[in-house]
Each structure stands twice: as C-alpha cells, then as structure tokens.
Amino acid sequence: MEQQDQSMKEGRLTLVLALATLIAAFGSSFQYGYNVAAVNSPALLMQQFYNETYYGRTGEFMEDFPLTLLWSVTVSMFPFGGFIGSLLVGPLVNKFGRKGALLFNNIFSIVPAILMGCSRVAKSFELIIISRLLVGICAGVSSNVVPMYLGELAPKNLRGALGVVPQLFITVGILVAQIFGLRNLLANVDGWPILLGLTGVPAALQLVLLPFFPESPRYLLIQKKDEAAAKKALQTLRGWDSVDREVAEIRQEDEAEKAAGFISVLKLFRMRSLRWQLLSIIVLMGGQQLSGVNAIYYYADQIYLSAGVPKEHVQFVTAGTGAVNVVMTFCAVFVVELLGRRLLLLLGFSICLVACCVLTAALALQDTVSWMPYISIVCVISYVIGHALGPSPIPALLITEIFLQSSRPSAFMVGGSVHWLSNFTVGLIFPFIQEGLGPYSFIVFAVICLLTTIYIFLIVPETKAKTFIEINQIFTKMNKVSEVYPEKEELKELPPVTLEQ
C-alpha cells in the first residue's frame, strides 16, 4: 500500500512539470507550427513586395519565372533550415543540456523575427529569405530537443501524454497563423511584416521563463555526473523529497551505458544492437512526411472550391481544418497512455490509407458525379484526424523512448534529418506528381501509408508504461546481440528492473 502511494506521488502531474512542459512547447514547438503557415496567406502580397522592391532597384519588374523561383527559394529555406537544425541537435544538447539548447535556440527565432518585421521598411526581400532559413534552423532544433527534454522530465506514466504536447503546440501554432493570416486581420499590405515578426514573442517569453525550471535529471546524472543536481531536479519536478527510486533507475541506465560512451551518428549506424531502433525511426519519420500530409493541405483549397465553397470563404474553411487538427491532437494527449503508442500509429496510418484511397476515387469521379466533391471534403477531414492521432505526434515520442541517453541525441539527429528531408522532398516533387498523375496522385501516399502500417504491425513494440531500460531490453532480444561483442553494445542483457512497482 505504501509502495502504491509512493508510485502515485512520483507519477503525478505537478505544477512545476506542467509549467515546464507548457513553456518549452509554447516557446519552441509553437513557433515551428506558426512559421509553417505564416507565409501561406500573405504569399501574393509578399511576392508583390518582392517585385516592387526589384522595380525600385532596377526600374523594371521581374518576369514570372524569376519571381516564382525567388518565392520557391523563400518557402524552401524553411525545411532546409530545419535539416541544418537537426544536425545541430547533438552538439547543442551535449554541450548546453536540453534546457540550455532550447534557450540558445531562441537566437534563431528572435533575430529573424526582428529582420522579417523590418523587411518592408528596409525594402529588402533578402532579409525574409535569410530569416526563413534561421527560423527553419530554430524549428529543426526545437522539433527534436523539446520531445527529448519533456521525455526526460516526465515520469513513465506521463511520458506519452507530455510527449504529444509538442505536436499539440505545433498544430496550435499553425491555427494561430491561419487566424492571424485572415485578410481582415494581418494578411494585408501593412500587416504581413507584423504577421511574420510575431514569431519572436514566444521565444522572448521562453527566454525569460524557462531558466527558472529544472534541467533534465537524466542529463545531469548520466552526462554531467552530478547526482545531487539530478536529485534536486527530480524533487522539484515531482513535488516531494523521496525520489530515490527514480535516481536508482537512472543510475542503472548509466551503468548499462558505461561501456558504450557517447554514440555518434556514424557509430549509431554501425551498431548492431541499435539496428531495429534506427530503422524504426527512419521508417516512422519518413512515413510521417511521405504519407502526404503536406500534399493534403496543398490540395485542400482546390477541393473546397470544387465543392462550391466561395473563394472568399475558403480561408475560413482552411482555418476550420486547422482547428480540427488541434482538437484531435489534444485528444491524442489524453488517449496515448490509455491506448498506447503502437495502436495510435496503426489506427492513424490506417485512417490516412483509407482517406487517400477514397479521395483518389472522389477526385477521379468529381466531374461526373455531382456529390463527389463533398466526399473529397470528408476525406480531407478524415485524413487530418488520422494523422493527428498517430503519425504526427508519436514518432518523436518514440525516439525518446527507444533510445538510451548515450544514443538519444544522435537518434534525434537522424530522425530529424529524415523528417526535414522528407518534408522538403514532398514539397519539391508533389507538383510534378500532381501534373503527371492528376487525381491519382494520392495513390502514391496510400502505398506509403500501407507499407508503414505493415512495418509498425510487424516490428514496432508497445512502449506504454515501461522504463527506458525495459524498452531497450525488448529491442535487445529483437536485435539478437546478447552474445555478439557485448562489451561494445549499448545495452547488455540486464536482469528485470525491480525498482518500479
């Protein structure tokens, strides 16, 4: 009875843990979502600014091709910056810690926010292009460090819920940008620089507030070898003094990893003991982006117009779709610990698979069957719901769970790189796929959803309510490494963990 009471106290959501989660997610993840959508509504106004600026310098307007190319560079700078940011994750979290990396990362938000806010006054579209690269770097770092930080702060029974919070704030950021981007708010000639510059507000708040919250206890004990600081951080996060059980579990993880030392990206690819973990994050991160989520949003406006939504009202319907995304991700926060990660992934990718197949049929028949455009709208909403439940929030959470401390930064670097390269690839090739395949474009994404679902069903284990050691014991058996150079493996066969009741 006493042990159960102790477990309940250790696993509760305290005010400090809740505030640390909200500040980290709002200050970092929110910006990612905001900058994804911030340039969509004012795109034509910004291109007009590019042209007027060019005219002011040369006395002539740009032709269509160079203007389109310049705008494409502006948009693509964000995922390119995200890729660069992913490569910085390992060095930053190992040098500054998880919290320190987030604080340092605010440079890549506040500086470009000022530059973008001043770009129209300065008559420089180059400032916007450079700033898009910088906010991309910010997003690349935050999309990896925030899940890592929260996953290491949370007790095991809350790790899933708190791990979904970053994705929730990404969707909130998208929705806020869509609302602020309405034409009667900031998507106008005078307002669009303010719309772009607002991304610095969450960063400034995080810079002021996050220093008052603890660093990751795992980072403090395993990497800094400061058990006293780790214990103090745990006591602050858990709201009581008796944290010896958790300290012992972290110490056990530290002992298990001493033979491995720091694991670089190159070493990560060479280690047989991590092959299924590594392959799983590559498949999940690739499947997340290559399943067509960006293409759905790209195609949504056209689908709404074909269904008879007036052109001037499409912006409101698009914001409504963003609201659905927020609501379903909010639901995922509460059901991830009830249903588990594996089931949400299977359910989410399956819904996306069916939505892509039905959408293909609806698009092919919309010219001959009058009510098919309405089916297309249902498919778009269904896809958004499915992706919000599993494919969007769960992969980053799983990277935290299936890797131990020594390999986790490098794993996030790999997962983040796959995420951003896949994002960039879809944005680059989807217009060509659409031109070549027309209404059958989404068959490509349906196939990717199917293959990812099969992989999850066959390979990915459930990690709900398990310690990091217990999860890695599952993969140790899958990788069959207990007798292959055990002194060089990240985790040897360990006796069952008895610290958690």
Curated annotation (Swiss-Prot):
Belongs to the major facilitator superfamily. Sugar transporter (TC 2.A.1.1) family. Glucose transporter subfamily. Disulfide bonds: none annotated. The chain crosses the membrane at residues 19-39, 69-91, 99-119, 127-149, 162-182, 193-213, 278-298, 314-334, 343-363, 372-394, 413-433, 440-460. It catalyses: D-fructose(out) = D-fructose(in). Residues 1-18, 92-98, 150-161, 214-277, 335-342, 395-412, 461-501 are cytoplasmic. This is Solute carrier family 2, facilitated glucose transporter member 5. Glycans are attached at N51. It comes from the Eukaryota. GO terms for biological process: cellular response to fructose stimulus; D-glucose import; dehydroascorbic acid transport. One of its GO terms (molecular function) is D-glucose transmembrane transporter activity. GO terms for cellular component: apical plasma membrane; plasma membrane; sarcolemma. It is found in: Apical cell membrane; Cell membrane; Cell membrane, Sarcolemma. PROSITE patterns: MFS (PS50850), SUGAR_TRANSPORT_1 (PS00216), SUGAR_TRANSPORT_2 (PS00217). CDD domains: MFS_GLUT_Class2. Residues 40-68, 120-126, 183-192, 299-313, 364-371, 434-439 are extracellular. It is a multi-pass membrane protein.
